[in-house]
Design a protein with these regions (language model features):
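S-adenosylmethionine
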Residues: 132, 136, 170-276
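A short helix-to-beta-strand connector/capping loop
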Residues: 61-62, 86, 103, 163, ...
Length: 276
């Protein structure tokens, strides 16, 4: 399965509008770049050929097919390790990982990977929320990761003590990338598959459900996902724009979740709620 990148130039003033236009795209696959002193905005969307071709047809721009070398950009300088609540560290190169005093709590994701490295507000907040709850989870707890992307949340769940993790994504490209990352991190408890977030009948019930999905898909898939959440389990969600968080929280509460605790970072929101 090949990865493609759609690119378009715009202005910084249009950033919010572009977030809304691209609301149906996994937020981990959307990168918006600005430069100091410039009012320009560069938009990148990573995905399959059909997705990027549709964007090109609807909005112009250009589409490029990415080689594996470009996708992971292994020539990029490694960044400093990212610490998550002092319980996880995300490394960008094997040399840095080798020096970690707690390798069992360390995650390797290559520097320059196109998406899903833990830098995006949606992923970073999910990781923090997961770190916060895991000390109090029952022994042998399990997780379901909906919209896994690069697999970072599933890998984090195993590193934090999950006995089993099921992770899926609708995009086969994401599953290919996540399989490579799971292998690189020597994870043995993660089962990956291509699946639709609105058709989750095959998955087992879990103590934690992670859903890094755009708001419309999150609302549509929540009834099925919550059926997979055990009583007293935790639902962690992200990928929601600040302008849409009230609607998402209302939908989740109508399905029986407690009022979510919401964390806002810039334009993005994440939340956590418990199932009674």
């Amino acid at each position: 399965m090949n990865m493609f990148r759609w690119t378009r130039q715009s202005t910084e003033a249009m950033e919010e509008i572009w977030h809304l236009r691209l609301a149906t795209i996994d937020p981990e696959c959307v990168v918006m770049l600005t430069r100091p002193g410039s009012k320009g905005l560069t938009i990148h969307v990573f995905g399959d050929q059909k997705t990027t071709a549709t964007l090109n047809k609807d909005f112009g721009g250009k589409v490029a097919r990415l080689s594996k070398e470009i996708l992971t950009n292994n020539s990029q300088q490694p960044r400093a390790a990212i610490s998550i609540r002092g319980r996880l560290r995300i490394h960008s190169d094997p040399a840095s990982l080798a020096g970690d005093p707690q390798p069992e709590r360390a995650i390797l994701l290559p520097a320059g990977m196109a998406f899903g490295t833990g830098d995006h507000a949606t992923t970073a907040t999910c990781l923090r929320l997961l770190c916060d709850i895991t000390p109090n989870l029952p022994s042998g707890w399990t997780a379901l990761d909906a919209g896994t992307g690069t697999g970072i949340l599933a890998i984090a769940a195993e590193k934090l003590g999950a006995a089993a993790v099921e992770a899926f994504d609708f995009d086969p490209v994401c599953i290919r990338v996540s399989k490579e990352n799971v292998h690189a991190n020597r994870c043995k408890k993660i089962a990956l598959s291509v699946a639709d977030a609105q058709r989750v009948g095959k998955f087992q019930k879990a103590d934690v459900v992670l859903a890094n999905l755009y708001s419309e898909l999150l609302i549509a898939s929540a009834p099925g996902l919550l059926k997979k959440l055990r009583s007293d389990g935790w639902f962690i969600f992200s990928g929601v724009l600040k302008t849409q968080i009230a609607e998402v929280c209302a939908a989740l509460q109508n399905l029986g979740l407690a009022k979510p605790k919401v964390v806002t970072r810039g334009k993005w929101c994440a939340g956590i709620a418990r199932k009674s």
